[in-house]
Regions:
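Helix-rich terminal scaffold detector
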Residues: 1-31
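FNR/FR-type flavoprotein reductase catalytic core
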Residues: 1-13, 121-307
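Ferredoxin-reductase
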Residues: 36-137, 141, 156, 192-194, ...
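Ligand-binding loop in jelly-roll beta-barrel domains
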Residues: 106-111, 152-156, 378-387
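Small/polar loops that bind or transfer phosphate-bearing groups
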Residues: 116, 161-162, 192, 254-255, ...
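C-terminal accessory/binding modules appended to enzymatic or scaffolding proteins
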Residues: 300-334, 338
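Iron-sulfur (Fe-S) cluster-binding segments and ferredoxin-like electron-carrier domains
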Residues: 312, 325-329, 334, 344-387
Length: 387
């Protein structure tokens, strides 16, 4: 076996750790006095639950508010720009949760900003916009998610394609890397419906004026008469006009699910490889029946019976994610991303059939043993589940 001791000496903190161990051994210590310290530190950095209080509410645009959340008890854990927290709420007796990207920079350690845009029929989003005021408290997960910039492997040409609410994670990521002086070229191609409803427009324009390596392109799809800016959608032609060559660029796509899907199609048509496209998780598909492999004859509006082994049963709509149906009927399942990524909402299908959306990050063994991610699973027949 090769001698690796000379390599270990170059690891940061290795020599100091060995010296501390040697000192402890001289006193006959068995290190029991340190038991639990690592667990305590991990719990501090990654607590299972946070208790947050709304400190401020800011009206950003006619359709959007920013909620500044501070810890109700102690410090907030650090996060990577682009990550989200899952906010738990109780609305009309229904316990549920939704993930929201943190729109503030990680350098602001005493608060998280959540920027929320109105959604047609949005159960939680519209509750936040219409009902929540300073002083209210919420439970939330710690920051999580994989949608963030990696300086080691993402290269030096970073392109953000943002639509509407996608301005929230884009703002945190772009402001963070620019403030750190990262040696790279940054592009933001930002699509919105109306010119008077652009989230963080002043912030992005100020950053573009201040930093020569940040290039901003704004596009409006439903402009008013007389609007003299760029019109249309973020199609392949618009993307290449804004960023030039797509070769070696890393793309970050953030916005509503239809926007993300459309942008990916455009990037693929330009020859961008999957590994150069990072997409923010943003909820289950709105119309699962339009997806490939949806069962022939399955009607989104149909009702099926969901039996929860040992707990009861209820009626659920085929076109509604199983997790949503469970929550509406009083069953709590741990969850975070609600996009098929984190796997916290796994349930086991004992009988019946479900449709798993492409977002579901299932393993081969999951299919073998019947596990599904309930946030992106749709019951297409009567089913029995276990969790």
């Amino acid at each position: 076996m090769s001698d690796t001791s000379h390599l270990l000496k170059h690891l940061v903190g290795y020599v100091e750790s060995r010296e501390r161990i040697a000192e402890r051994e001289k006193t006959g210590s068995d290190f029991s006095e340190d038991k639990g310290k690592n667990s305590a530190q991990i719990a501090k950095l990654h607590p299972k639950r946070l208790q947050l209080e709304v400190a401020e509410v800011t009206q950003e645009t006619p359709s959007t508010k920013t909620f500044r959340l501070k810890s109700a008890h102690g410090e907030l854990p650090p996060f990577q720009a682009g990550q989200y927290i899952n906010l738990f709420v109780t609305i009309d007796g229904v316990e549920t949760a939704r993930p929201y990207a943190i729109s503030s920079c990680p350098s602001h350690r005493d608060y998280y900003d959540l920027t929320v845009k109105i959604v047609e029929g949005g159960f939680v989003t519209n509750y936040l916009l219409n009902k929540v005021e300073p002083g209210q408290q919420f439970s939330a997960t710690s920051p999580m998610g994989t949608f963030y910039y990696n300086p080691i492997i993402h290269g030096k040409k970073l392109v953000f394609l943002a639509g509407g609410s996608g301005g929230a994670p884009a703002r945190a990521m772009i402001e963070s890397v620019l403030n750190r002086g990262v040696d790279a070229e940054f592009y933001l191609v930002y699509g919105n419906s109306f010119e008077n409803d652009v989230i963080f427009q002043d912030t992005f324009q100020a950053l573009a004026a201040k930093h020569d390596n940040f290039h901003l392109t704004e596009v409006i799809s439903r402009p008013s008469e007389g609007f003299d800016g760029l019109r249309g959608h973020l199609n392949a032609e618009r993307i290449t006009e804004a960023v030039g060559s797509v070769e070696d660029a890393m793309f970050y796509v953030c916005g509503p699910t239809p926007f993300n899907e459309y942008c990916k199609e455009q990037l693929v048509s330009l020859g961008v490889k999957d590994k150069r496209i990072r997409i923010e998780c943003n909820g289950p598909p709105k119309q699962p029946s339009a997806l490939e492999h949806w069962p022939a004859g399955a009607d989104e509006q149909a009702m099926v019976t969901v039996k929860v082994r040992g707990k009861g049963e209820f009626k659920a709509q085929v076109g509604e994610p199983l997790l949503n149906s469970l929550e509406r009927n009083g069953y709590f399942v741990e969850n975070a991303c609600r996009s098929g990524e984190c796997s916290l909402c796994r349930v086991k299908v004992m009988e019946g059939e479900v449709f798993n959306a492409p977002e579901s990050k299932l393993r081969k063994s999951d299919a073998t043993f019947g596990w599904v991610h309930s946030c992106v699973a749709f019951p297409t027949t009567d089913i029995e589940i276990l969790f």
